[in-house]
Amino acid sequence: MRLAFWLYEGTALHGISRVTNSMKGVHTVYHAPQGDDYITATYTMLERTPEFPALSISVVRGRDLAQGVSRLPATLQQVEEHYHPELSVIAPSCSTALLQEDLHQLAAQSGVPQDKLMVYAVNPFRVTENEAADGLLTALVKRYAAEGPKTAAPTVNLLGFTSLGFHLKANLTSIRRLLTTLGVKVNVVAPWGAGIADLKRLPEAWLTIAPFREIGQTAAAYLEETFGVPTEYGTPLGVEPTLRWLRAVIEKLNTVGAKEGATPIAMPELHAFSLDGMSAPSGVPWFARTADMESFSNKKAFVFGDATTTVAMVKFLRDELGMQIIGAGTYLERHADWVRKELDGYLPGALMVTERFQDVAQVIEDEMPDLVCGTQMERHSCRKLDVPCMVVCPPTHIENHLLGYYPFLGFDGADVIADRVYISCKLGLEKHLIDFFGDAGLEYEEPSASSENGSAPLSAGTATPAAAPEEGGMAWTDEAETMLKKVPFFVRKKVRKNTENFAEENGESRVSVEVFRRAKESLGG
């Protein structure tokens, strides 16, 4: 029944296609029932690129099964004749796994040269999006990476940047800007924009940068083990992490450079990393000490997402913005131990590990934090609860695939995140003022509606009604409801809940103005 609800991770096909759709001259052939090619709609809706997704479906039909035939060989021939890919990756589906079809044998019957075919026989029942993507990228690197001479000047590989990646192009631009300032060129970005020839050149780089634990680090480890290409695994999210990342990159490049007889790379002046080349590279350090941001030390944040982002965001919010972390979690169980280790000392309790968005929504409702950093699922949950939320990692929706420059990595990314945090927490003041001064000459009306206890309808001049009690909640008098409306909307639900708890503990059957005032005093309001 889980498929009837949202899922944090997509299927294995989703991960496979994220890799192949990122590359040039690579096509995916999915052997599955009709309708499983829905993935193409995802890319055309979200990906801001002019190319159509490089994916075809080899349809599994009941008639073909009854006749003991398969359409896969013919589909491979059609793909070869129409698209002329350098490589076709054949992906199984749950249906073909149940049928126990031999995809290697079927591919051999197609007549397409075997060096242009790759069967990625992942178990579609057990493997999900990120694991499938990481596995396919690693398989491609193992197949094509070839020994070659090091580049004359210092270069790096950037691994793990894939189609539908969070703020993909902006993050790549930010990383490239940092490297350019160091005088370092990019050898290969993979899989995004890479072809087969690029994969062959991976061992020529001096260093591999793999900032995402979910995708790319396994392939980077293979390059290091097989070809001796060192790897930098750090994620430059935040000002201090970016500085540490730069120092680590310089140190590792200079280690290789010493063997090559190259001139050592020196850390430039910090202003060299800024957009204008004259000012500080990020405004976060001073912004965090302003009166506006110092008030954030009392604000509580909850973070939920993939492993890389959860760790990086928790550290950024606490270390650089001074917010209180009331909890964090991840939907990637296989990376949970790493997240726990990285966040040791940052969390007041245990790390939350779940694939059920309902569990995350319940924690948010119970804690009512001042800010939630999560996924598209948390955005939906927080909307119902009037809790500020910013999306920081997949799964995402169209508003997180932007044309503009909004990186999350590097110094530029630190500024973007700080702005998003500030806006997410602070905006809403206008709505609160409308709630508070709703009858001060505003030229709009809302339909009258009866209050919860069946009394007279609210006046037409009244702005947004107070939050209605949940099912089974306590009754409120009209006067108490009016007082509740003067509470900012983004904490109104929490105030209602706390007041009702106070009333129940004190034997009150309903919330009156007097009960509301006593509750406010007892809670320190």
UniProtKB/Swiss-Prot annotation:
EC number: 1.3.7.7
Enzymatic class: oxidoreductase
Residues involved in [4Fe-4S] cluster binding: 36
Domain of life per record: Bacteria
GO BP: light-independent bacteriochlorophyll biosynthetic process; photosynthesis, dark reaction
Xref: NCBIfam families: DPOR_BchB, PRK02910.1-3
PANTHER family: LIGHT-INDEPENDENT PROTOCHLOROPHYLLIDE REDUCTASE SUBUNIT B
Name the UniProt record assigns to this protein: Light-independent protochlorophyllide reductase subunit B
Organism (species): Chlorobium luteolum (strain DSM 273 / BCRC 81028 / 2530) (Pelodictyon luteolum)
Gene behind this protein: bchB
